[in-house]
């Protein structure tokens, strides 16, 4: 099974990529949508270029895609890139930080990836999953969402148990202050987060 992983650089897409590898599948590339607009219903906005470093560390190509973030258009922009109609050079330049050194082994995917399926790290967003599923139908490939509706605590514990280095990159909920920024999610911090999640009623896994 040859797959592309939709990678935002976040914990869930990283876990989805690991899941595919553990199944013995060939990860042909990581695909990252960089939003040039102010908002997106589909894709993560901040820090997505880190996915290029993840691709380099995995030894797989990276396919950067630009999107204006407009509702209903953004999934079509991703689909167009997966069909091989993508200015990968421009997408790389606009996605990459000038302050970063490009890894020597980072390979930029050119053209359409030869895949049987697309793997995504969607947890609970019907909006996102439905649109990815429909896109995959149009492309003639299978859509896999291995984390779909996983229980929050179990999912976070699995990340810690399997050695993922998860860092909190932003906070936008009551109960979480700037002291959490950059903090690693481990057994201790996860227990603290779980208590705060109960009190302030946010999702432990960061969804929504």
Question: What label would you give each PLM region?
Answer:
Residues 170-208:
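A conserved mid-domain beta-alpha-beta active-site/ligand-binding segment of alpha/beta enzyme cores
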Residues 1-169:
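ATP-dependent adenylation/nucleotidyltransferase module used to activate substrates
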């Amino acid at each position: 099974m040859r797959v592309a992983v939709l990678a935002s650089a976040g914990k869930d897409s990283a876990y989805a990529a690991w899941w595919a590898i553990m199944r013995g599948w060939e990860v042909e590339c990581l695909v990252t949508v960089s939003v040039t607009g102010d908002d997106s219903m589909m894709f993560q906005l901040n820090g997505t270029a880190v996915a290029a470093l993840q691709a380099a560390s995995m030894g797989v190509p990276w396919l950067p895609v630009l999107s204006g973030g407009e509702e209903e258009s953004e999934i079509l922009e991703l689909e167009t890139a997966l069909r091989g109609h993508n200015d990968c050079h421009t997408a790389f330049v606009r996605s990459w930080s000038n302050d970063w050194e490009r890894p020597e082994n980072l390979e930029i995917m050119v053209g359409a990836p030869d895949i049987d399926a697309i793997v995504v790290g969607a947890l609970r967003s019907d909006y996102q999953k439905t649109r990815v599923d429909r896109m995959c139908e149009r492309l003639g490939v299978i859509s896999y969402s291995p984390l779909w509706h996983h229980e929050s605590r179990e999912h976070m514990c699995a990340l810690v148990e399997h050695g993922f280095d998860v860092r909190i990159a932003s906070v936008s909920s009551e109960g979480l202050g700037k002291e959490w920024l950059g903090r690693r999610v481990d057994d201790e911090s996860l227990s603290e987060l779980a208590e705060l999640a109960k009190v302030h009623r946010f999702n432990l896994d960061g969804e929504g």
